[in-house]
């Protein structure tokens, strides 16, 4: 009894940590915004957004159904609370809090599928992993896929724990069919993850009920009919969103089966999942030999999907979230060494701090500051010159050398003249040239008769890491409107030494310095721009 109380206290502490990490401003990957917030910001709030290509291509490869099932409730709640005056940052925090809450479905599944003697060990080890504290609290489709994966295993195990002629077994079959279809519509990789549990539990179920073929047949009929009905419902829901009948998972499969398509997102060695991504996600546990024992069915729950996904050359760590999560659960059941568990927890803490707090954590504050700058209209630069922003006039915001900015957080009206552009791969010379070209197309002088003053209507903004311009002569013609000091960027170490990125950390919001003589804008380009040309 005392031991259970101790475990419960530790688990409560880990839950508090999970909720705390969910409220951070870290930015793990652009897809956590592109494939969720960008969709609902346009759909529910009427804000101007740049929809991701998966939803705008002629053959869409993403279904909106999983998003509607898992995320729509919290977005509707936010809209009901704030009415027409919604602020993007509270929406972000509420949604991450909601993701944290629904991640408890994984904890519930672990509690029910793990044997009693290893239940606390598995639950605590998983809860201490950085996947639970970071990835599962962010709005990734991979996180939603992981929830559906564990629910699938839960219903399969429940179906095996009761006779098939019991009424409750029909409910398990019904829920299993729905969850499986929703998981597949979330990501087609879901099929790779559920092959092993379906085979394992189906064989066990058949052996237990071999003398009841009618019950087996009835459950199969229920499973097939409910699955078919769910598929039709998903297709109809996608039709309402896209305006045409589309089978998104089929388009997704065709797209990802072509190497030339995958090459646009980056090609990796087919060994990346095994030798890089799984070790990254699982830390020191990956080196425990007993967890690789292929004679145990639990090993195949993670080994088979990793092998299948390794056949595709585009490989990212988040693609393995379900496999890595079940690997951690299995570790909690089999690993007895406290030293190995301690090393894993220390490793998880470091990764949780990095991904949950530090990683690209200046991007979201930078976007919010851009929103404030535009809404304030009158801004004083560090050189004490006044700039005037008119949201009704064309304004271009360039995001350079940072993750694709979550532009939904600008909360622009649907027909706003404020445009955004992400130019990650531009060189410094190309970026500065592009900036000035746009600036001289858009900048104007505005007379303010009430104040009897003349100010510049600034139009073009540049948001980028300050390290990229710190040692550049190009900086002399730019003025910084705002500085976000806390930003960890390890993606530009190929261009700048890591020490320089650390020393000159942070993100700056820049615009052109005042270039005027006698209240008129000169048509002469800055010297540095002429050198670019």
From Swiss-Prot:
It is found in: Endoplasmic reticulum membrane. One of its GO terms (molecular function) is alpha-1,2-mannosyltransferase activity. Its EC number is 2.4.1.-. Glycans are attached at residues 261, 378, 419, 425, 452, 477, 518. Keywords: Endoplasmic reticulum, Glycoprotein, Glycosyltransferase, GPI-anchor biosynthesis, Membrane, Transferase, Transmembrane, Transmembrane helix. Pathway: Glycolipid biosynthesis; glycosylphosphatidylinositol-anchor biosynthesis. GO terms for biological process: GPI anchor biosynthetic process. Pfam families: Glyco_transf_22 (PF03901). One of its GO terms (cellular component) is endoplasmic reticulum. Alpha-1,2-mannosyltransferase involved in glycosylphosphatidylinositol-anchor biosynthesis. Transfers a fourth mannose to trimannosyl-GPIs during GPI precursor assembly. The presence of a fourth mannose in GPI is essential in fungi. Belongs to the glycosyltransferase 22 family. PIGZ subfamily. This is GPI mannosyltransferase 4. It comes from Schizosaccharomyces pombe (strain 972 / ATCC 24843).
